[in-house]
Regions:
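N-proximal helix/coil linker or "cap" segments that precede and/or mark the start of modular domains
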Residues: 1-6
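C-terminal scaffold of the Radical SAM
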Residues: 7-23, 42-66, 71-352
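Local cysteine-cluster metal-coordination motifs and their immediate loop/turn environment
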Residues: 27-42
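Short, well-ordered alpha-helical microsegments
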Residues: 120-121, 357, 387
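Short amphipathic alpha-helical interaction segments
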Residues: 352-366
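A short, conserved structural fragment
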Residues: 365-375
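Minor-groove-contacting beta-hairpin "wing" of winged helix-turn-helix DNA-binding domains
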Residues: 376-380
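Short, amphipathic alpha-helical interaction segments positioned at domain boundaries
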Residues: 382-399
């Protein structure tokens, strides 16, 4: 059953999503094991009925195509979970159905997340043949002891081998690293990051370890058993080192945690950050869809089997929340200010119904906390460390 929550709206810009593009997110909820820091919707299953999952995805693609016909598709992202556990044949059929419904942009990007333990040359060749043209690999650390502490199932040697295999099949390969780990010091992070940058060709994501409630790490932290987490000062220094080393390697920050060579930024993630429309398919997937009636946030049921069964039964257990103009303005600023390029003043004026007052942030501009260039507002290097306050003041300037 589809549920709709209405919020008041003082005006809807039904074409605003075009400024950010259009993407499709496919959530594969299964993993070989649950990492202790992970708060994503991922599950360990003894067996998976691959055929029934494939057909559920195909049905949902058909349904959403009816709501978004005529759009040009910028990107597809297979996330999870561990999508590299999906058979290449499933990925092929999903992409075939997507291609049937939506024409692709000239620079169309299709990313699949992979863990080093689920990598083999034949599988990756199959993904490439299916139409995947970018891999995002969850390496997380180049230190074996830390991989064990993070609950990862691969070694550093296996990660490097998996990366090489991916490079043989794909022109674009990114990988994730986690810093501010237990007992980690800033200079040891610098050494590790330099090793990673020597491997990385065009894109790297570096995330600070966060302790989330509802995870194994969260439980240990609450019981005082998660020892050696860096002090805030050291964690901040590691963030600064990340900016320094990535920029020196020719991959500057284009988003808070993402670094890329020019022209190699993730197209799909920019659909999110530039506040475009995207379809979320799979258990727990979120989306943003604009219709003639307005813009909606969508969210599906978290439980894998409940989601799949609802698709087959035609119940479509998901929520559609109508986003008011204020909701859209807040989301636009929250997402866009994460990017180094920032947000368009013209679009800010449109979404705020002309209420943006530059004078209310002029002090922050003069203090070089907010930058201004070519009709864009962005957080400076100093402002990025104060991003929540920057966002607050920009939204306040739209009151």
């Amino acid at each position: 059953m589809q549920t709709v929550s209405e919020n008041s709206s003082r005006g809807v810009l039904v074409a605003d999503w075009r400024n950010g593009g259009f993407g499709v997110y496919i959530h594969w909820p299964f993993c070989a094991a649950k990492c202790p820091y992970c708060d994503f919707n991922s599950h360990v299953a003894k067996s998976i009925d691959q055929s029934s999952w494939k057909n559920a995805y195909l049905r949902e693609i058909d349904r959403y195509a009816d709501l978004t016909s005529g759009r040009v598709l910028n990107s597809v992202f297979f996330g999870g979970g561990t999508p590299s556990l999906m058979p290449p044949e499933t990925v092929h059929e999903v992409l075939e159905r997507i291609r049937f419904h939506w024409p692709k942009a000239n620079n169309f990007e299709c990313t699949l997340e992979a863990n080093p333990t689920s990598v083999d040359a034949g599988r990756f060749a199959g993904y490439a043949a299916a139409g995947v043209n970018r891999i995002s690999m969850g390496i997380q650390s180049l230190r074996d002891d830390d991989l064990v502490a993070l609950g990862r199932m691969h070694t550093v040697a296996e990660a490097k081998q998996a990366f090489d295999i991916a490079r043989n099949s794909f022109d674009r390969v990114s990988f994730d690293l986690i810093y501010a780990r237990q007992h980690q010091e800033p200079e040891s992070w610098r050494i590790e990051l330099k090793e990673a940058l020597y491997m990385a060709v065009d894109h790297i994501s570096a995330y600070q370890l966060t302790i989330e409630q509802g995870t194994a790490f969260g439980d240990r932290y609450n019981r005082g058993l998660l020892k050696g987490l860096p002090e805030d000062e050291n964690a901040e220094r590691m963030y600064e080192i990340t900016q320094e080393e990535c920029a020196a390697a020719g991959m500057p920050r284009y988003e808070v945690s993402n670094h890329a060579a020019p022209g190699q930024e993730s197209i799909h993630n920019q659909v999110y950050w530039k506040y475009g429309d995207y379809i979320g398919i799979g258990p727990g997937a979120h989306g943003r869809i604009t219709t003639p009636q307005g813009r909606y946030g969508t969210e599906t049921h978290l439980a894998p089997e409940i989601w799949k069964n609802s698709v087959y039964e035609g119940n479509n257990i998901e929520s559609w929340t109508h986003l008011s103009a204020d909701d859209q303005l807040s989301e636009f600023v929250l997402m866009g200010m994460r990017m180094a390029s920032g947000i368009s003043v013209h679009r800010l004026n449109e979404l705020s119904n002309g209420s943006f007052k530059r004078a209310k942030i002029s002090d922050l501009i003069e203090m070089s906390i907010i930058g201004e260039s070519d009709g864009m507002l962005f957080a400076t290097q100093t402002g990025t460390k104060l991003l929540n306050q920057v966002i607050y003041h920009i939204l306040d300037a739209c009151e």
